Amino acid sequence: MGIPELLSSVVCPGGQGDVSIVDNLLIMSVEQTRSRIDCGLQGVSKEASPDRFRGIRIFDISNLSQPKQVGAVQTCRGSHTHSVVAGPDQDGKIIVYNSGTQGVRDEEEMEECIGNIPGDNRTALFRIDVIEIPLSLIHI
């Protein structure tokens, strides 16, 4: 038996960090508002920004010494935790349930994100996201 060792590390701020592995893909929860889609270290302004990332990141880990981000799915409240519930199926899709606990993004940043409007059933406050990851669109 060998001694466990660190093979590689990826710097990609965003907090939370729950992970799941499906074949050669690593799916990672990202919740904090400072994270960027490009994994940059400079953070994001407090205003609505196309650079901000909150949701799940998808990494190709077929080469463990060089993991690389190959996909990302934005969500209204980020991803505090997720569960892979199916896949890949015969159509080459992975299904992930996602739950975020951060505040709802501004609609300026993500149009379908509706916050606390009394009586509005479309609110993102209490929802669970169902995310479909088609492997044919992931470039690995």
Model-derived features with residue positions:
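Feature marking well-ordered beta-strand scaffolds used for ligand recognition
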Residues: 1-138
